[in-house]
């Protein structure tokens, strides 16, 4: 079950029926949601959200930050736990259609096209939630989740390439979900996943390309052969993110064996 990849995050949802619904939402998600990077261009998200599984890690980070925010003393006794749980589902679902519906993604990928972020993905994700009306939760609760999902882009709600204007957050819940997503998207805020074994599936080392300037876009295995001193320098001087950290360590270990 796909939702098993979010077992730690699902544990933070206290209402049994809302947690069960969150599992359904994740299990029904497009396969790409668990595989692609959070940013199709690499411009708008931190290193941990790039590469294979980046969107999944970004989603985990959004919920983690949401839980930090909602746990502050200033919010104590302001909201009931059920309301907070609906926000947790919104965090998990906010980018669940980031590259469009499963059909749209598969059609583009089949033709070998690069699949970019779809601007109206908040609206698609909100509709994804509304499609469960009458099944798991009360309709008004589904609407609370859908509204938080549709407005998660906040002030970045227009595009030069689209005529669509996305809604901005209005309720306190919508504003907190947006804030969590905003903070999880900052390049200078790092999130550690070292204790979350499900958060990172390493890509194939044989096809992984170096992200750093000197050997940018060269196969890392080739760099290990042509410039092994560079890998040693990285190991000693650079605070590398995954998967680069694991790969460099592995290549250096193989060199000494």
Task: Tell me what each language-model feature is.
Residues 1-108:
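Acidic/His-rich, divalent-metal-binding segments that scaffold phosphate/diphosphate chemistry
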Residues 14-15, 149, 217:
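Extracellular/surface recognition and adhesion modules
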Residues 58, 94, 121-122, 152-153:
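Histidine-centered active-site/metal-ligand motif
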Residues 63, 67, 86, 122-126, ...:
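An amphipathic alpha-helix signature
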Residues 78, 87-88, 135-196:
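Histidine/acidic-rich helix-loop-helix segments that form or flank divalent-metal centers
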Residues 100-105, 111, 160-161, 188-189:
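A short secondary-structure junction signal
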Residues 108-128:
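Divalent-cation-assisted or electrostatically stabilized phosphate/pyrophosphate-binding catalytic cores
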């Amino acid at each position: 079950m796909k939702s098993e990849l979010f077992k730690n995050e699902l544990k933070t949802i206290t209402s049994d029926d809302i947690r069960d619904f969150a599992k359904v939402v994740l299990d029904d998600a497009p396969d790409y949601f668990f595989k692609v990077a959070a940013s199709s261009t690499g411009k708008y998200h931190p290193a941990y959200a790039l590469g294979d599984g980046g969107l999944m890690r970004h989603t985990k980070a959004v919920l983690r930050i949401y839980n930090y925010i909602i746990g502050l003393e200033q919010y104590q006794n302001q909201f009931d736990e059920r309301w907070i749980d609906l926000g947790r589902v919104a965090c998990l679902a906010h980018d669940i259609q980031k590259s469009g519906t499963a059909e749209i993604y598969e059609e583009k990928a089949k033709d070998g096209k690069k699949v970019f972020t779809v601007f109206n993905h908040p609206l698609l994700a909100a509709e994804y939630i509304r499609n469960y009306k009458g099944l798991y939760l009360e309709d008004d609760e589904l609407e609370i989740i859908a509204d938080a999902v549709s407005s998660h882009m906040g002030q970045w709600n227009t595009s030069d390439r689209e005529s669509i204007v996305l809604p901005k957050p209005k309720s306190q819940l919508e504003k907190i979900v947006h804030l969590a997503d905003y903070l999880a998207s900052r390049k200078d805020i790092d999130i550690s996943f070292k204790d979350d074994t499900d958060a990172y599936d390493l890509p194939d080392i044989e096809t992984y390309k170096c992200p750093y300037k000197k050997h940018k876009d060269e196969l890392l295995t080739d760099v290990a052969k042509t410039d092994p001193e560079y890998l040693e320098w990285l190991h000693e001087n650079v605070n590398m993110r995954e998967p680069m950290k694991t790969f460099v360590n592995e290549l250096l270990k193989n060199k000494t064996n």
